[in-house]
Each structure stands twice: as structure tokens, then as C-alpha cells.
Amino acid sequence: MAIEVKNLEQLKSMRKAGLVVADTLELLKRTAQIGMTTLELDEIAATNLVKHGATSSFLGYHGFPAVICASVNEEVVHGIPNKRKLVSGDLLSIDFGAIIEGWHGDAAISFGLGEIDPADQKLMDVCEESMWRGIAAGKKGAKLTDISAAIEGYINSQGKYGILREYGGHGIGSAMHQEPHILNFGPAGNGPEL
């Protein structure tokens, strides 16, 4: 596994891209309304990219036709924005990536619109907390799969939730997807030292 190690200047460029991603995701969360379409949200994100002098990590990536991935309700990941109108109770997950100075930023956000079923809100809360547990486990001296174990451990402690084994986290830098691939499950203590 070859992990691309970044120097301080490269990290500064990545931070710029990450700030564009954060700004855009917050804009989309504030803007998303019942009756809008995910295609309209994609247009808002594209405009914000231009405003920041960034380009899309997603548009054209393996033929992807949009700047955001927008998954509604049971759509798992990488949904293509479309003309379906959002309704009260919808769960929306938006994944977004930006490039500045050749360096990528990439993140996702999930939220509900209108009246959210408490069970759906709990699902989103468990997912978010598992992410924070994984981040906390990724400290200096830890092993890569300590992150995986922290995510899985928290999800399992919450009872009835499963883990999609086909998806996980990834490194990022001069390409959107880089080593290491970070599973959301597995035993601690394996992989490269962080």
C-alpha cells in the first residue's frame, strides 16, 4: 500500500479545496427545500465552484454527469441528481468534491427535510457518531484498522444497524481516491501505523 505523504504546502492547497467543499455543503444544506430537485442543488454547487475558482472532482469522473452525488432515502451512495422533487421526510445525502491547485477535497453530508421519522433521525445520528469515533481513533501511532474497529464497534453497540461492506473511506490528495482504503468494519491493530 503506497500512501502519498503530503508536505506542508500541499496540505495548504488541500485545505483550500476542503474549505470550498465545506462551504458548498453548508450552502446546499441551507438551500435545500421541500419541492426542490437534486438537479437544482447540483446547479447551485456548480455555481459555488466557479465562485471559488475551483473545479469539480466528480464531473466526468468515470463518466459521472454531475458535480454532486445526491442520494435520497434508500439510495445508498453516488446518486445522480435528477428532477424528482424532494418531499417532507426525505433523507438526503450529498457527496461533493472540489479541486484547487491540483489538490482534492471531498466530503459528504446527510440531513432530513421537513418532518423526519425519529427512527430515520436515529440512523443518521448513529452514522455521524460512528464517523467521529473513527476520526478520534485515527491518532498518531494508531494502526489503520483501529479506525475501522472504532466505527464498527460503535455501530454494533447501537443495536439493529448494519454496515455496507462495499463502501468505506479513502485517502485523498492529488487524486480523489487514494490509498489507504479504510473499511468501516474489522479488527483493530492492523495496517500501517498512522
PLM regions and their residue ranges:
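Active-site neighborhoods and metal-handling regions in enzymes and metal-associated proteins
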Residues: M1-L194
